Regions:
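N-terminal small/glycine-rich loop or linker at the start of catalytic domains
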Residues: 1-13, 45-68, 101, 106-109, ...
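Glycine-rich, positively charged N-terminal anion/phosphate-binding segment
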Residues: 1-2, 17-93
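Alpha/beta catalytic cores of nucleotide-metabolism and tRNA/nucleoside-modifying enzymes
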Residues: 8, 18, 24, 132-134, ...
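Hydrophobic faces of well-ordered beta-strands that scaffold small-molecule active sites
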Residues: 12-16, 37-39, 68-72, 95, ...
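Active-site beta-loop-alpha junctions enriched in small/polar residues
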Residues: 17-19, 42-44, 73-75, 100-102, ...
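Alpha/beta enzyme core
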Residues: 81-111, 120-196
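Hydrophobic alpha-helical membrane-association signature
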Residues: 118-125, 250-251, 271
């Protein structure tokens, strides 16, 4: 799959997920076969004002063996343009813009999925990003805002007209958040509406899902999100490739990478959520969740890993 001038080794993409797609998770996903990984969403305005918490989201030292996209969110074209030009983004291969986040505090600012109701602003935001870089600019959207507002095909056309290189479609509405089923027919309609690559997202958990999404929608790529949490090897499974997965070794590598650029306290907090997902397919899942509630120090973290993994 090719996005603009960036060639991917396959059509599988790790979805951006706030608080989860840190450098450790992105590295492991790349090792197990992801063709592209994407950062957690980063505030364009925060980047412009050099928010100290933003730099950690942009770590690329352990990028793995595939291209990496940075995902920005914002609704002000000027801030988007300045963010794209920021030196901290120089090592990213693709610029992605979030137009799908359903969280209330983002939506109330007119950002994320709120943009699905404002095609004129969508055009201006994408155009601003495209004008600021030679790299491909992509956009992640949802099916629509409310369940009776399926605007993805219209928004995708606007993105293409503004110079967007690809569009990823989470086939749920903002109203759904992450509940109910993804409507893959929306992905098909988007694919029929534009000439740029379309990436499908939603309810892909096994190889059969991956193959069916490709066949029924005609999408060019498939983005995997929650199904990859604690299971970076899903990218090998979806491609029907052999793999070996040592969960303890994966956790330790994850911690090692985070420790290269984050303070110990932040590493511990970051790993609390990650450990729950690493444990979800083990017989110790409940014990791990209970132990995490009392996790305070690195020694506690190591004890949990040694005891349950």
């Amino acid at each position: 799959m090719k996005i603009g001038n960036v060639q991917l080794k396959n059509d599988l993409i790790l979805a951006p997920m706030a608080n989860y797609t840190d450098a450790g998770m992105r590295y492991l996903a790349s090792v197990y076969g992801a063709g592209l990984t994407v950062t957690e969403m980063v505030s364009a305005k925060g980047l412009c004002f050099n928010n100290p918490n933003t730099a950690a989201l942009l770590e690329t030292r352990e990028r793995g063996n595939c291209p990496v996209a940075v995902q920005l969110f914002g609704a002000d074209p000027e801030y988007i343009k300045k963010a794209v030009e920021h030196p901290l983004l120089k090592d990213f291969d693709i610029i992605d813009i979030n137009m799908g986040c359903p969280v209330a505090k983002v939506v109330k600012n007119g950002e994320g999925s709120a943009l699905l109701r404002n095609p004129d602003l969508v055009y201006k935001v994408v155009k601003a990003a495209v004008s600021a870089t030679n790299r491909p600019v992509t956009v992640k959207i949802r099916a629509g805002f409310e369940n009776d507002e399926i605007t993805a095909p219209e928004i995708a056309k606007v993105i293409e007209e503004a110079g967007g290189a690809a569009v990823a479609v989470h086939a749920r509405t903002r109203e759904q958040f992450y509940s109910g089923n993804a409507d893959w027919n929306v992905i098909k309609k988007v694919k029929e509406s534009v000439g740029i690559p379309v990436v499908g997202n939603g309810d892909v958990e096994k190889r059969d899902d991956y193959l069916r999404m490709k066949e029924t929608t005609g999408c060019d790529g498939v983005m995997v999100g929650r199904a990859a949490l604690g299971m970076p090897f899903i990218f090998a499974k979806l491609q029907d490739k052999e793999y070996e997965f040592d969960v303890k070794a994966a956790i330790m590598k994850h911690i090692e990478i985070l420790g290269e650029y984050l303070p110990e306290r932040t590493v511990i907090n970051q790993m609390k959520a990650q450990l729950c997902f690493y444990a979800k397919n083990t017989r110790h899942a409940k014990d791990v969740r209970r132990a995490i509630s009392e996790l305070k120090t690195r020694d506690d973290l190591m004890r949990i890993i040694d005891e349950f993994f």
